[in-house]
Amino acid sequence: MQDQLRADECCKYLKALGEPERLRIVECLQGGPKTVSEISRDIGSAIANVSHHLKQLRFAGLVCGERSGRNVIYSLSPAFAGKAAGKAPLKVLDFGCCRIELGKK
């Protein structure tokens, strides 16, 4: 039963990352917190499109947002994002069932 719950939870995260635009957003946020406008500019996508995908990433728990005046500053969820040992620019999303390395070429 526990394995089934863990698999279901992991699938939720992987499904959220299954859209190329969402993966680009997560990769963009590995550089640090950003507003929707900054993300939109950095990945070359419309603000409305970025907002839609951020909503899905927030729902899955991969991204969190904090209001700052009129803006919301988005960042990778601390529960999943961390530095890989010895490789400062590389970020890892650790879901417990699997790990995804971002920024590795």
How should each PLM-predicted stretch be described?
Residues E9-A46, V72-A81:
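N-terminal helix-turn-helix DNA-binding core of bacterial DNA-binding proteins
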Residues R41, R58-F59:
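Alpha-helical residues within the helix-turn-helix
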Residues G32-T35, G61, R70, G96:
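A generic structural signal for short beta-strands and their flanking turns/coil linkers
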Residues L54-K55:
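Short, hydrophobic-biased segments on the C-terminal half of alpha helices
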